[in-house]
Amino acid sequence: VPGNKDTTLNTIRGLEGLPAHLTHIQFHSYGNEGDFKFSSGAAEIAELVNANKNISIDVGQVMFGQTVTASGDNMRQFANNHHADPKKWVCMDIECDAGCGVVPFRYKDQNFVNALQWAIGLETFLLVDDPWRVFLTTDHPNGAPFTTYPHLIRLLMDKSFRQDMLQTINP
């Protein structure tokens, strides 16, 4: 949701030194600036994480390619079924008490939102000073399968490779 970075920032501030781990923070690091009202809030979040030693995070890095979204929020999965790629998905309800949904999804490097999500994750990894407080994750399978970890590690460790990849995505 564009603008959700404010909730993340307020959550960190509101903890007032209590220890906390924030999961899949890339999905909660969106600003609402720019022509499309969708931007990165990673720098602000990384700055606050760096200033609050009580906070650890995992990134939930988006990687380009095929994955699936899996969630117990079957109503959200139902609402997102039009994004299914390929156009097959499943959603089930168990006596109105519980449910789940699985929607196949393809993150595309030429899609503005997907490219920005990818960049926000990398930005977060690279701006948090203490590597022991930022965990390498893709929110498997939602951001990408864990099998993309070698590619992600290369993106983080090889600046020229990262720059080459940046040249190929949606500007």
Where are these regions (language model features)?
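Generic long, charged, amphipathic alpha-helical segments
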Residues: F161-P171
